[in-house]
Amino acid sequence: MRVSSILSLATSLVSVVQAHTLFTTLYINDVKQGQGDGTCVRENTDLAHANSPVRDLSSDDMACGIGGTVPVNYTCPAPAGAKLTFEYRLNPSKAGQGFIDESHKGPVAVYAKRISSPSADAAGSGWFKLWGEGYDMEADKWATEKIIETNGLISIQIPTALPAGNYLFRPEVVAMHNVTPEVEPQFYIGCAQVFLESSVTGDLNVPSEKSVSIPGYLKKDDPSVIYNIYTDEEYAHPKKPYPMMGPEPFVPAAVSKAASGKVTRQSEGGIPDSCLLVNGNWCGVEVPSYKDDLQGCWNAVKNCWSQADACWAQQLASGGRNCEVWGGKCKDLDSHCSAKDFTGPPAYELKSDDYPAPGPIPAAFNAGDTPQDTSSSTEAPSTTKVVVISSVPVTVTVIPTPTPSTSASLEPIPDFTPRPTSTNTAQPSQTSKPKPHCGGRRRMRTR
């Protein structure tokens, strides 16, 4: 017996341009946050163009990317001085396929902004840079080329002197390959919602010359914006230095804390303990229990599939693999009800379908610039893992990472797990591809 009123899940066949990139995954102290990808990350919700760049310097999308003005459900806690790592992907839903096309050269930076709550507006004043790199003349490499070598992983250390509270951490990857007097760079931006747990409290005082408004921190005629990476002058010897975008990094002075300093902990926006499985910023909770109750059994099945429907509806560009995992639980419930087992819910092992990191997580790029806490006391530890409390066992299974290619093709590739079209979660074949979207023909560098 099955419930005829269970909603059918619509098919979503979308794809992205393989030359581009998207920030999909947050690590805190080398630990992936949540289950799957996208937890605590503001991603572009237009799945068909998820890794498309921001091109308008005056747009609010410059703050946290396209659609990034909308907060996500969860904020991840991080202890003072933690290392944050931002994973970028060519194909948002498939790890290990590269970072960005090698032709897309330019600077990389990480900004931060303290906010009053996770729902606060990202656009506007209060942004400051934690780290940035442009063109390394000695190594003859752009920052993007170095991040290709780290498999799209960008690591920074949170300065220990930053006061506790809600922050947006904003990685910024810029591609300069198509820049002309009429064409602006391509910005690949995202934001991670993080609550910094620390015994440092009070106001955050950033010098005016290092505090910027986003949008507004760049102008169309800035030397860093109109810089042409292909002209002979820039590749002459000696090479012409690249004028880095934005302000100089802000490094707060070291602080000294008393041994009894109280650590401010996160009180809102965390992942609830009732979550059995997480996909991005969706979580599944246990269905209502029932005992010797036929209708209660089928109501539980309906509840489960309703949650699966919500999972697919809320899937991010980083995919819906755990929506498929949750569907397995629903099918198991269905089979128990069909077998007239009307007491439950039955135990079911949920295995998060996680990709491992695409390579070794690099050390913080700004580690040498960040002063350490001078106190001898040890701050109380803060967890950065999601702890799931449930009567149903939950384990994590790591699936193998595809071998990254040495150079990325410019052909568009299918992206995202399609939604199942019925309650048996069968997946349709992928039948469409998008047109390439890269802002014009690639110019060859001249010497």
Task: Walk through the language-model features, giving the residues of each.
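Peripheral, solvent-exposed domain-edge segments
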Residues: 2-6, 13-108, 116-150, 183-186, ...
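Signal that preferentially marks extracellular ectodomain short beta-strand elements
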Residues: 152-162
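Surface-exposed loops/turns
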Residues: 80, 163-164
